[in-house]
Amino acid sequence: MDELQLKLCDIQGRLFELSGTQEIPSEAFIKAFMTSETAKALDSTYNRMQWMGEEYLLEEVKDAAGDILSASGEIFQTDVLYWIGYLYRYWHYYTGEPSNKILRQAPIETMKRNYLMFHTMARELAIEDLKEIHAQKK
């Protein structure tokens, strides 16, 4: 993984964290982001979105999602949000899979439930374990 890719993982982690600080319900935000054109743009080899900061990216997601993000819902702790955002982006670079497919394999509830156990693991191992959990549910 190169330096730019790791920086983009950090930006996505901070984006998820920022959604919590702005009191956007976490499940609604994560689903809206991971299935958005913004996430799709970040998945591409090169896109101008990759050079935007988390504040700009959040506005893009909010504009596209509309009222979905104003519903009530739980707001996860910022460390949990950062880890989920970081790992989802890392997962994309590690496997080449698109964001929407990653979300299907590691749903939000699975990520939240496994945070305490997985956040200290090597990222690759956490991803492989999450893929295994998904495979067992099939």
Feature-to-residue mapping (PLM):
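Thiolate-centered catalytic microenvironments shared by cysteine-dependent enzyme domains
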Residues: 100-103
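C-terminal alpha-helical interaction appendages
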Residues: 1-94, 106-109, 118-136
